[in-house]
C-alpha cells in the first residue's frame, strides 16, 4: 500500500496518514505495529501522562507504538474524536487477525484521502479525564 505521512486535516491532530492510491472497501491498509507488551505493563503505561499509541489485542497482549514512529499506522487519526470537522468521517476500522492488528478500509477510499479510524469510546473517555486533570493541575499552579 502506498501511504505517506503529512499534516492532518483535523485541527490540532498533528500528522495524519494518507493514501496515494485508491483502496477498496475491506482491504487491509496497514498493520498496526509497535512494541508487544503484557497486561500489567499495559496498565502501568495507561497511568502515564503522555501520548498513547496503545492497542489492546486481547486480555494479555497489547501493542504500544509510542516509541516506534517508523511504523506509519500510528498516524491514522480518529475523525470522531474530540476535534471534529463537518463532512469528515472515519473510513476504516481496526481489526485483529490472531496476534496482529490491521487498519482495514470500511468503505472505498480515494487516492489522496486521509485514513481515519475509530479509536473507541473508552480511548476518548480516558483522554477527556486526562485533559481535565491537566487543566485542574494548571489552575492550581496559578494560585
Regions found by a protein language model. Give the residues of each.
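Short aromatic-glycine motifs in intrinsically disordered, low-complexity regions
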Residues: 8-19
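Polybasic, lysine-enriched low-complexity intrinsically disordered terminal tails
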Residues: 25, 82, 139-143
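Short, compositionally biased
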Residues: 37-52, 126-143
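Tight coil/turn sites that cap or link beta-strands
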Residues: 23-26, 112
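Catalytic core of the SET domain in histone-lysine N-methyltransferases
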Residues: 1-10, 50-125
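Acidic glycine-/aspartate-rich tracts in secreted/extracellular proteins
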Residues: 34-36, 81
Amino acid at each position: 500500500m502506498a501511504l505517506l505521512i503529512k499534516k492532518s486535516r483535523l485541527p490540532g491532530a498533528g500528522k495524519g496518514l494518507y493514501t496515494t492510491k485508491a483502496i477498496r472497501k475491506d482491504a487491509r491498509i496497514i498493520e498496526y505495529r509497535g512494541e508487544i507488551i503484557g497486561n500489567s505493563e499495559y496498565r502501568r503505561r495507561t497511568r502515564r501522562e503522555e501520548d498513547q499509541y496503545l492497542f489492546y489485542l486481547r486480555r494479555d497482549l497489547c501493542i504500544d507504538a509510542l516509541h516506534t514512529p517508523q511504523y506509519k499506522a500510528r498516524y491514522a487519526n480518529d475523525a470522531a474524536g474530540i476535534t471534529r470537522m463537518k463532512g469528515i468521517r472515519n473510513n476504516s476500522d481496526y481489526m485483529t487477525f490472531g496476534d496482529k492488528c490491521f487498519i482495514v478500509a470500511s468503505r472505498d477510499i480515494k487516492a489522496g484521502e486521509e485514513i481515519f479510524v475509530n479509536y473507541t469510546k473508552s480511548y476518548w473517555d480516558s483522554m477527556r479525564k486526562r485533559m481535565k486533570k491537566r487543566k485542574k493541575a494548571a489552575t492550581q499552579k496559578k494560585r
